[in-house]
C-alpha cells in the first residue's frame, strides 16, 4: 500500500512501474487530468468574485441550462486533454459529438467526462465535481465510447468542496488525494479506500417518490427507515457518491414517469462511479443488471442508478422488479 503523503504524480509513476510493458501513455493522460483539475478548482474557489456564477444563456445537448462555470470547466478539460496528445478522442457531457484529437491520432485511449457535475448547485456553494472515464481505443469512430463499463482502464472524480480531493482507480483499488495549495500538489490522504460492507445512510430524492415507476423501491426505502437509516441527499452526484464511498449505504437515482430511462448519463456519470465503487468493494445496478455490464447504444444514454455497499444493493434487489 502506498504511504500517506505521496503526491499523485509519483503514485501514478509507481503504479506504472508495476507493469513493465507500460508505455507511460496512461500516466501522462492522468497527469493531464490532474492539471485541468487544479485550474478548475481555482475557478470554483474564485467563482463568486470572477463573474462566473449563473447561467451562460445556452442549453446543452442534455436539454439543461448551461452554467458559466460549466462552460469554463469544459473548455479547460478540452484544452488540457487535447494538448496532452494522449487521447484519440474525447466525449463531454456538454457536447453533441466526440472531439477527435489531431495530436492524439495515434493515441491508445479515449476519455468521457462530465466537466462539472452538480453545476446547478454552484450558486449556493454546494460541493461539485469533475468525473472521468478512460477506455482503450478499439477503433476509429464512435465504437470507442460504446464499450461496457467493466472495460474501463481508469476512472475517477475530483470533488471541489471544503477541500479538493482527487479519487482515482486504475483497476487496482481506489485511492484519494487531497490538494495542498501550499505546495500545489495532490497528496495521498485516503489510501486503499474500502466502502463499508453495510452503511446507515441512504441518498435518494424522495420528493420524486410519487413519480417512481417501481413500487418495490418505495417499500425498500420504507424498510430502511424502519431499520433506522438516515436520509442524506445533496443533489450533486459527486458529493452524494463520495459520502456513500466513505460512509457506506446507498445512492440512488431511479427512473420515473418523466425520465423513463433514468436521468444520469451512463458514460459520464453512472459507469465511472460504478467502477470506482466496485473497486472499493461495493456494487451497482440499474435495477435490472450491473451498471458495468450495460453496453451503451448512444454516447448520451441515460440509465437508472443504484450504487453503494453490498448489503444495501443486495437488499434493494430483493425489493425491486
UniProtKB/Swiss-Prot annotation:
<dbReference type="Pfam" id="PF18913">
    <property type="entry name" value="FBPase_C"/>
</dbReference>
<dbReference type="GO" id="GO:0006094">
    <property type="term" value="P:gluconeogenesis"/>
</dbReference>
<feature type="binding site">
    <location>
        <begin position="117"/>
        <end position="120"/>
    </location>
    <ligand>
        <name>substrate</name>
    </ligand>
</feature>
<protein>
    <recommendedName>
        <fullName>Fructose-1,6-bisphosphatase class 1</fullName>
        <ecNumber>3.1.3.11</ecNumber>
    </recommendedName>
</protein>
<feature type="binding site">
    <location>
        <position position="205"/>
    </location>
    <ligand>
        <name>substrate</name>
    </ligand>
</feature>
<dbReference type="GO" id="GO:0006002">
    <property type="term" value="P:fructose 6-phosphate metabolic process"/>
</dbReference>
<feature type="binding site">
    <location>
        <position position="263"/>
    </location>
    <ligand>
        <name>substrate</name>
    </ligand>
</feature>
<feature type="binding site">
    <location>
        <position position="93"/>
    </location>
    <ligand>
        <name>Mg(2+) 1</name>
    </ligand>
</feature>
<feature type="binding site">
    <location>
        <position position="114"/>
    </location>
    <ligand>
        <name>Mg(2+) 1</name>
    </ligand>
</feature>
<dbReference type="InterPro" id="IPR028343">
    <property type="entry name" value="FBPtase"/>
</dbReference>
<keyword id="KW-0963">Cytoplasm</keyword>
<dbReference type="Pfam" id="PF00316">
    <property type="entry name" value="FBPase"/>
</dbReference>
<dbReference type="InterPro" id="IPR044015">
    <property type="entry name" value="FBPase_C_dom"/>
</dbReference>
<dbReference type="GO" id="GO:0000287">
    <property type="term" value="F:magnesium ion binding"/>
</dbReference>
<dbReference type="InterPro" id="IPR000146">
    <property type="entry name" value="FBPase_class-1"/>
</dbReference>
<comment type="subunit">
    <text>Homotetramer.</text>
</comment>
<dbReference type="GO" id="GO:0042132">
    <property type="term" value="F:fructose 1,6-bisphosphate 1-phosphatase activity"/>
</dbReference>
<dbReference type="GO" id="GO:0030388">
    <property type="term" value="P:fructose 1,6-bisphosphate metabolic process"/>
</dbReference>
<feature type="binding site">
    <location>
        <position position="116"/>
    </location>
    <ligand>
        <name>Mg(2+) 1</name>
    </ligand>
</feature>
<keyword id="KW-0378">Hydrolase</keyword>
<keyword id="KW-0460">Magnesium</keyword>
<comment type="pathway">
    <text>Carbohydrate biosynthesis; gluconeogenesis.</text>
</comment>
<keyword id="KW-0479">Metal-binding</keyword>
<feature type="binding site">
    <location>
        <position position="269"/>
    </location>
    <ligand>
        <name>Mg(2+) 2</name>
    </ligand>
</feature>
<feature type="binding site">
    <location>
        <position position="114"/>
    </location>
    <ligand>
        <name>Mg(2+) 2</name>
    </ligand>
</feature>
<comment type="similarity">
    <text>Belongs to the FBPase class 1 family.</text>
</comment>
<feature type="binding site">
    <location>
        <position position="117"/>
    </location>
    <ligand>
        <name>Mg(2+) 2</name>
    </ligand>
</feature>
<dbReference type="GO" id="GO:0005829">
    <property type="term" value="C:cytosol"/>
</dbReference>
<dbReference type="InterPro" id="IPR033391">
    <property type="entry name" value="FBPase_N"/>
</dbReference>
<dbReference type="InterPro" id="IPR020548">
    <property type="entry name" value="Fructose_bisphosphatase_AS"/>
</dbReference>
<feature type="binding site">
    <location>
        <position position="233"/>
    </location>
    <ligand>
        <name>substrate</name>
    </ligand>
</feature>
<dbReference type="GO" id="GO:0006000">
    <property type="term" value="P:fructose metabolic process"/>
</dbReference>
<keyword id="KW-0119">Carbohydrate metabolism</keyword>
<dbReference type="GO" id="GO:0005986">
    <property type="term" value="P:sucrose biosynthetic process"/>
</dbReference>
Amino acid at each position: 500500500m502506498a504511504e500517506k503523503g505521496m503526491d499523485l504524480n509519483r503514485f501514478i509513476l509507481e503504479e506504472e512501474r508495476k507493469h513493465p510493458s507500460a508505455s507511460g501513455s496512461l500516466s501522462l493522460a492522468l497527469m493531464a487530468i490532474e492539471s485541468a483539475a487544479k485550474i478548475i478548482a481555482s475557478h470554483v474557489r474564485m467563482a463568486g468574485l470572477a463573474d462566473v456564477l449563473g447561467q451562460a444563456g445556452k442549453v446543452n445537448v442534455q436539454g439543461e441550462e448551461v452554467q458559466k462555470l460549466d462552460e469554463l470547466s469544459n473548455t479547460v478539460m478540452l484544452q488540457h486533454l487535447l494538448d496532452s496528445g494522449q487521447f484519440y478522442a474525447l466525449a463531454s457531457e456538454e457536447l453533441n459529438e466526440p472531439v477527435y484529437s489531431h495530436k492524439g491520432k495515434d493515441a491508445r485511449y479515449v476519455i468521457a467526462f462530465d466537466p462539472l457535475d452538480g453545476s446547478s448547485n454552484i450558486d449556493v456553494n454546494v460541493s461539485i465535481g469533475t468525473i472521468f472515464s478512460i477506455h482503450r481505443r478499439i477503433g476509429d469512430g464512435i465504437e470507442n465510447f460504446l464499450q461496457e463499463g467493466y472495460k474501463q482502464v481508469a476512472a475517477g472524480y475530483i470533488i471541489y468542496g471544503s477541500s479538493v480531493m482527487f479519487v482515482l482507480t486504475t483497476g487496482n483499488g481506489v485511492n484519494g488525494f487531497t490538494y495542498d495549495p501550499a505546495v500545489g500538489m495532490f497528496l495521498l490522504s485516503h489510501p486503499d479506500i474500502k466502502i463499508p460492507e453495510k452503511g446507515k445512510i441512504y441518498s435518494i430524492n424522495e420528493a420524486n417518490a410519487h413519480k417512481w415507476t417501481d413500487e418495490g423501491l418505495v417499500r425498500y426505502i420504507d424498510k430502511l427507515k424502519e431499520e433506522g437509516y438516515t436520509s442524506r441527499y445533496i443533489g450533486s452526484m459527486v458529493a452524494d457518491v463520495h459520502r456513500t464511498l466513505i460512509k457506506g449505504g446507498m445512492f440512488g437515482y431511479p427512473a420515473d414517469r418523466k425520465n423513463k430511462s433514468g436521468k444520469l448519463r451512463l458514460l459520464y456519470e453512472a459507469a465511472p462511479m460504478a467502477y470506482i465503487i466496485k473497486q472499493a468493494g461495493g456494487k451497482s445496478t440499474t435495477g435490472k443488471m450491473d451498471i458495468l455490464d450495460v453496453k451503451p447504444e448512444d454516447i448520451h444514454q441515460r440509465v437508472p442508478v443504484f450504487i453503494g455497499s453490498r448489503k444495501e444493493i443486495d437488499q434493494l434487489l430483493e425489493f425491486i422488479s
